[in-house]
A protein has these predicted regions:
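Rhodanese-like catalytic fold shared by cysteine-dependent sulfurtransferases
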Residues: 1-23, 30-61, 70-108
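Short, surface-exposed ligand- or partner-binding patches at beta-edge/loop junctions that are enriched
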Residues: 65
Length: 108
């Protein structure tokens, strides 16, 4: 199993607020994103990642997001196996983001 790093929602928010250039990859389904969008994120559903891998930059720092952090962890591990060296999973997903970093994001 490939080890991946994780980032807490509050740490990601601080980095984004500072203007750090972090690529946010949201792997949720379109219906989930419609309920609780992550501003500025690029959206590729988890099941489409292998066929759309060439759309992603393996050299860019990437934070992968889903609802609770499980799908995003799987995608982050896959990306790491594919040679992405700067990939992180958002701990707790958009749900934890809403709870701890941005309460204006709806919870579902």
């Amino acid at each position: 199993m490939t080890d991946i790093g994780a980032i807490e929602p509050t740490a990601l928010k601080a980095r984004l607020d500072r203007g750090d250039r972090v690529f946010i990859l949201d792997v949720r389904e379109p219906a989930e994103i419609a309920v609780a969008p992550f501003p500025g994120a690029s959206h590729i559903p988890m099941g489409d990642i292998p066929s759309r891998l060439t759309e992603l930059d393996p050299d860019r720092e990437t934070v992968v997001v889903c609802h609770h952090g499980l799908r995003s962890a799987q995608v982050a591990m896959y990306l790491a196996r594919m040679g992405f060296e700067r990939v992180l999973n958002l701990s707790g997903g958009i749900d934890a983001w809403s709870e701890t970093a941005d309460p204006t994001t709806p919870r579902y």
